[in-house]
Amino acid sequence: MDTQAFRRSLHHSDRYNRRGFDSPTKRAQALEEAYQSDLITSIRNNSFTYKKGRLNIKLAQAFGFCWGVERAVAMAYETRRHYPDENIWITNEIIHNPSVNDHLRKMNVKFISAKNGIKDFSLVSDGDVVILPAFGATVQEMKLLHEKGCHIIDTTCPWVSKVWHTVEKHKKHTFTSIIHGKFKHEETLATSSFADKYLVVLNLEEANYVSEYILGRGNKNHFLNKFAQAFSNGFDPDKDLDRVGVANQTTMLKSETEEIGKVFEKTMLHKFGPEKLNSHFLAFNTICDATEERQDAMFSLVDEDLDILVVIGGYNSSNTTHLQEIAINKNISSFHIDTPERISVKENSILHKPLKSEMVLKKNFIPDGEIKVGITSGASTPDKIVADVIEKLIAITK
């Protein structure tokens, strides 16, 4: 399928909208009313610090809603106002934030159901309005919705679209796309649908494994079993890893994406020599600015003398879990929560989710005496949620 030609055709359809309905000023005002916090604004204006009694708060200097998320959420709300009586569907969570998605449900936006990873579009009819979330949608989903005669509201983050352009470039020049991401993540599913041959690698360990295979040090059956579900149909590692380009899920750890790019550049340099490198490796630049800023701010935050650190964001939010990884790697006692309700003021407890683990209840999580708490949040977390967490910490330390 010529995905570029399809996208061009879709963009010229009178049933496709990727700009929204409100002016930038009205959009900003609506978001400010819904999600901004005077407390957070005050803390930002005070060098990201706050003190109340024995509680000392240090906020990361970049956290919370990014531009792409703000745009997607605003467009989703605008869509209901613009189509007050129509059936409105969304193909997935608009962003990985439970409060925002719950608000859409209260606005009678229906979420496409899925079973075993297969979405059921049977209830979507001609003339219905369908929102594509910030992560994007697969090209097959877009084609299906277009053929059904739906009004498509595309809130895909422009940084995600940039990655799609990258893998389409790989396809045009017959390169296999190596995508740094989680193969079941909505964004990676969308990105891979625009590729021809692709392989998804989760981390540096998997990238090094692929590198060894390219250099002739691996077993094909083991390779195929290890990456089952993470490569394109008909993928043959003996043929499809001679020419590779790297792309990424925009919310992955920036430093690891860069390392993975270096791994494959060095691998192709070793196998084919400098004179043929450009024929076998395509450089990339698909790291999202907002992801980079939040991770850099987190690296600065963990250098502070913190007693504990609270990371706020959806449990299925990739960018949030990577922020937590940074804290863990610095051996800081950190707690990942998705909503302020995970904190009990009465019990001085926090119900949190450690990495790759089930929920854990930590009692007496705020110790006696002076305490310095670091706080950050993922790109899908509104300021009001962060403020509500801080208010609970204030109440505990009174």
From Swiss-Prot:
GO terms for molecular function: 4 iron, 4 sulfur cluster binding; 4-hydroxy-3-methylbut-2-enyl diphosphate reductase activity; metal ion binding. Binds 1 [4Fe-4S] cluster per subunit. Its EC number is 1.17.7.4. It comes from the Bacteria. It is an enzyme of class 1 (oxidoreductase). Pathway: Isoprenoid biosynthesis; dimethylallyl diphosphate biosynthesis; dimethylallyl diphosphate from (2E)-4-hydroxy-3-methylbutenyl diphosphate: step 1/1; Isoprenoid biosynthesis; isopentenyl diphosphate biosynthesis via DXP pathway; isopentenyl diphosphate from 1-deoxy-D-xylulose 5-phosphate: step 6/6. Dimethylallyl diphosphate binds at residues 96, 185, 317-319, 380. It catalyses: isopentenyl diphosphate + 2 oxidized [2Fe-2S]-[ferredoxin] + H2O = (2E)-4-hydroxy-3-methylbut-2-enyl diphosphate + 2 reduced [2Fe-2S]-[ferredoxin] + 2 H(+); dimethylallyl diphosphate + 2 oxidized [2Fe-2S]-[ferredoxin] + H2O = (2E)-4-hydroxy-3-methylbut-2-enyl diphosphate + 2 reduced [2Fe-2S]-[ferredoxin] + 2 H(+). Keywords: 4Fe-4S, Iron, Iron-sulfur, Isoprene biosynthesis, Metal-binding, Oxidoreductase. The active site is at residue 187. Its cofactor is [4Fe-4S] cluster. (2E)-4-hydroxy-3-methylbut-2-enyl diphosphate binds at residues 96, 185, 250, 317-319, 380. [4Fe-4S] cluster binds at residues 66, 157, 288. InterPro entries: LytB/IspH. Isopentenyl diphosphate binds at residues 96, 185, 317-319, 380. One of its GO terms (biological process) is terpenoid biosynthetic process. Catalyzes the conversion of 1-hydroxy-2-methyl-2-(E)-butenyl 4-diphosphate (HMBPP) into a mixture of isopentenyl diphosphate (IPP) and dimethylallyl diphosphate (DMAPP). Acts in the terminal step of the DOXP/MEP pathway for isoprenoid precursor biosynthesis. PANTHER family: 4-HYDROXY-3-METHYLBUT-2-ENYL DIPHOSPHATE REDUCTASE, CHLOROPLASTIC. Belongs to the IspH family. This is 4-hydroxy-3-methylbut-2-enyl diphosphate reductase. It comes from Prochlorococcus marinus subsp. pastoris (strain CCMP1986 / NIES-2087 / MED4). The gene is ispH.
